């Protein structure tokens, strides 16, 4: 009976780890057809009206320039002009398809992540007792570690998150989140987040060491600073 009770929180933790992947897989399959039909039937004509408007305008200006070029080369043979017009027509259709696929992709991924967040929040709320048990296990495990191992683990974690080489890792992580939500890659926003987020984490971590670790385990703080130096 005790083993069964101990297995339940472990199963709950495993389900939390794999549940987002299952939700994402199911939602992508079930929502993609509905969102595609909704977009293609133009029910979303007022939705995302201003998003990418500038980019769309620039693309059509480029196409307009191509048509102006068409007028400039009328002295070319008629067969070449027909091929030229056909090429412009194909490029226009291709651009419209890419534009629609981008918005469908954005709506799909944003909806999937929102649904995953709601389901996981409800799942975590109804499983608070199991989370408390898992938390007690983690605290007991950390308490049994020596101060040297704790200091080494903290130093390793901080070097990975806010160390010298951490910006590249943050760039990959934030870029993955952007891609997962279906957003376009904006270099300026990405650079701003990469340059500020580790600094904020570093400040929070130093405050945590000063307020919490100094009160709970002063020896751990001494060992941490000794290893860090």
Curated annotation (Swiss-Prot):
Subcellular location: Plastid, Chloroplast inner membrane
Classification via Pfam families: CemA
Key words, A-Z: Antiport, Chloroplast, Hydrogen ion transport, Ion transport, Membrane, Plastid, Plastid inner membrane, Potassium, Potassium transport, Transmembrane, Transmembrane helix, Transport
Reactions listed under catalytic activity: K(+)(in) + H(+)(out) = K(+)(out) + H(+)(in)
InterPro entries: CemA
Chief location category: plastid
Transmembrane segments: 6-26, 107-127, 189-209
GO cellular component: chloroplast inner membrane
GO biological process, one term: potassium ion transport
Molecular-function annotations in GO: antiporter activity; proton transmembrane transporter activity
Membrane topology according to the record: Multi-pass membrane protein
Stretches of the chain forming a coiled coil according to its record: none
Family: Belongs to the CemA family.
HAMAP family in alphabetical order: CemA_PxcA
General function of this protein: Contributes to K(+)/H(+) antiport activity by supporting proton efflux to control proton extrusion and homeostasis in chloroplasts in a light-dependent manner to modulate photosynthesis. Prevents excessive induction of non-photochemical quenching (NPQ) under continuous-light conditions. Indirectly promotes efficient inorganic carbon uptake into chloroplasts.
Protein name, as recorded: Potassium/proton antiporter CemA
Naturally occurring in which organism (per UniProt): Draba nemorosa
Lineage: Eukaryota, Viridiplantae, Streptophyta, Embryophyta, Tracheophyta
Gene that encodes it: cemA
């Amino acid at each position: 009976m005790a083993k069964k009770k101990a297995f339940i929180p472990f199963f709950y933790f495993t389900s939390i780890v794999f549940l987002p992947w299952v939700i994402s897989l199911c939602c992508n399959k079930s929502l993609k057809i509905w969102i595609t039909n909704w977009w293609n039937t133009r029910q979303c004509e007022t939705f995302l009206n201003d998003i990418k408007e500038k980019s769309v305008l620039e693309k059509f200006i480029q196409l307009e320039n191509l048509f102006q070029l068409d007028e400039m080369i009328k002295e070319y043979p008629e067969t070449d002009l027909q091929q030229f017009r056909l090429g412009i027509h194909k490029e226009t259709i291709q651009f419209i398809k890419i534009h629609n696929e981008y918005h469908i992709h954005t709506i799909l991924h944003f909806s999937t992540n929102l649904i995953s967040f709601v389901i996981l929040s409800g799942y975590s709320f109804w499983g608070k007792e199991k989370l408390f048990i898992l938390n007690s296990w983690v605290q007991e495990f950390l308490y049994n570690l020596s101060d040297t191992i704790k200091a080494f683990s903290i130093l390793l974690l901080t070097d990975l998150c806010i160390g010298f080489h951490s910006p590249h890792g943050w760039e990959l992580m934030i870029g993955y989140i952007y891609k997962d939500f279906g957003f376009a890659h904006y270099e300026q926003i990405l650079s701003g987040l990469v340059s500020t987020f580790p600094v904020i984490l570093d400040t929070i971590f130093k405050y945590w060491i000063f307020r919490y670790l100094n009160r709970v385990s002063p020896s751990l703080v001494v060992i941490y600073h000794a290893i860090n130096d």
